[in-house]
Curated annotation (Swiss-Prot):
Pfam families: Toxin_cobra-type. It comes from Bungarus candidus. This is Weak toxin 3. It comes from the Eukaryota. Binds with low affinity to muscular (alpha-1-beta-1-delta-epsilon/CHRNA1-CHRNB1-CHRND-CHRNE) and very low affinity to neuronal (alpha-7/CHRNA7) nicotinic acetylcholine receptor (nAChR).
Amino acid sequence: MKTLLLTLVVVTIVCLDLGYTLTCLICPEKDCQKVHTCRNEEKICVKRFYDKNQLGWRAQRGCAVSCPKAKPNETVQCCSTDDCNR
């Protein structure tokens, strides 16, 4: 009986997705509070700053598989802990 119970527990653990899922902020505002659960393959939070037509800097936040390269007139910050892209 104990063996059967142990087997069921092991099978349950293997079948469940017990992997860690990262959360990142996804809104463009300065005081961003909107949290998004990233897909399993997205392990990076990104915050991009870019110059919006000489009207000042804007931020774009989200999840990514890898840290993107910065484009001209853009700064990219990457991190890998929950909600680290504030």
